[in-house]
Amino acid sequence: MTKILVIDDELEICKQISLILSKQGYEVTYANSYKEFSDLEQRNFDYDVVLVDLWLKNSTKQGIDIIEYLKNKYENLVIVSFSGHANIDNAIESVKAGANDFIEKPFETKKLIHIIQKNLLELKQRVTINNYRNKISFHSKIDTIG
């Protein structure tokens, strides 16, 4: 089962997203602040997708900080950023920080699900390609020994 972490300072948004995605068969957890995210991350981080709001009120760090941290620490993770104060600069900044995609709040359920599914498929394809590359590289090394 695909595990998703939602990070947003608005509890109702977290609950709504959790309900929507749970109905789609995803296992969803949420955090309302950087501190809650940090606590979850330190315990056992085994998520496939992280949805992160760019602007977290009353937090020591913002969504961009979380994106950069996650991208540097976890190679095979889908990160989707979102914001209710969206503009093209926010989208570009979040992708430069390491997000796979960006969605503007409020968003339609279908669009959110599509973005998650699309990015999970792309991740699966990248992992498969990398596995094949590693196998080819390994066999090439064996062929050249001696």
Segments (PLM) and residue ranges:
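Two-component/phosphorelay signaling modules centered on CheY-like receiver
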Residues: 11-30, 35
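Acidic, metal-coordinating helix/loop segments flanking the phosphotransfer/catalytic sites
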Residues: 30-49, 57-58
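C-terminal output helix
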Residues: 87, 107-116
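The C-terminal output helix
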Residues: 117-131
